[in-house]
């Protein structure tokens, strides 16, 4: 992009911002993006009744590893939310319009920021957004999966922030969480996330925005995954596949597209390519576009999204942002623009679809059978994370952990140590067996605090020394206050009474509800081998402070 083009792009941004300031955040109409709804296995325009085909591109700016490392925690998020930055999105929208896209896939947004300007500007150009609910640091981990209060709160905050926009097409509850046969046990957690996100939308007076899943194209798992997410009582609303089988100048017959189309014929929910664009040949010719929107595939597939808009180290971009924050068009851009311009899928109206046949019944799909080493996703799902229950742990546990931040390796270290000393079954979640501990839905800090408190009680603690030497470990003075029979935490306390310590005379005091950090020695490797009493050291100042609290001086 030359200086003249950069100048005009800046003018467009300035004009749009002025219009927003003069007319308010609702100055742009959403008439060009009526809500898209699902009927059977198709997307339809809710006003015209015409079938909707996704013709889109992935749109997400990433921070480089070097940038994150040099920043030393200065950034609010590890990702860049372009939809919350009008300078970025308004710069890019003219180029997205040139591409001929009608949908963006965005992988992470900051729910604390306003997205009004960018979402309204996209709507003015007839563009929708498919949005992932997770973000890089808050998501379901395929190797150690959990569906807990922390992740659920993230999902709810995104839903609350974005559901008012009519051009919000749908949410992804996960992306490639199970990516091969070694981690199929992670899929029950994603399915639980779909269930709870849909339930939250339903009970929060939000528009009924669909929630789906984006998977990879692994040969060993793709059939079972496709069945798993539409079987049983909990089902995805749509299903995306990150598809990279077509490279260069492949064909419908040689690429694998023919086989995939046959496999998904009659699939009960909308299915589309949530990513496509193999880059083994550069510039990419994007010849797969003509096949995807052609007669052989458009009756099965609801379109797709090219990966991706921004050029990064992985070399999948169609534009490159230059040193002046301007946009330089790459050869891939011209090829994708040309292919999208030719794409003209022949759809069906909602009325024709309903008249031709009844929508496919999702209930008819049988869940895949468990096969060790092949498919190990149980039909039984984790329960909905219970925020109130988990918050009670913060009130009643004697020892408490606060987040370790950059020292995330401590979680694994401390869990390994504590679970060698106490029974951790109440925090374990097993997607293979369908067994989920009572507190497996709590945050990682709450789960670690529970196990630390067990060890504190196991060693017969009669003071306020928690058995880990770490600045993030606290003795919880709030736990010393006796619970009344009316307390909402009484049931939680009763459920762990047999594994936690009765603080005896401490309950007679009325300490402050603050938390007190203790300088307690972390057991050495030799001490960890002993199951008996562990010696702990504290500074004289801390001993004095504890004595003062016990005497009521700090009331």
UniProtKB/Swiss-Prot annotation:
Domain of life: Eukaryota
Binding of (1,3-beta-D-glucosyl)n 2, residues: 176, 217, 222
Gene Ontology MF terms in the entry: 1,3-beta-glucanosyltransferase activity
EC class (word): transferase
Cysteines paired by S-S bonds: 89-118, 231-367, 247-278, 390-442, 392-489, 399-466, 419-424
Annotated effect of mutating residue 307 to Q: Moderately reduces catalytic activity
Family: Belongs to the glycosyl hydrolase 72 family.
Name of this chain's protein: 1,3-beta-glucanosyltransferase GAS2
Native species: Saccharomyces cerevisiae (strain ATCC 204508 / S288c)
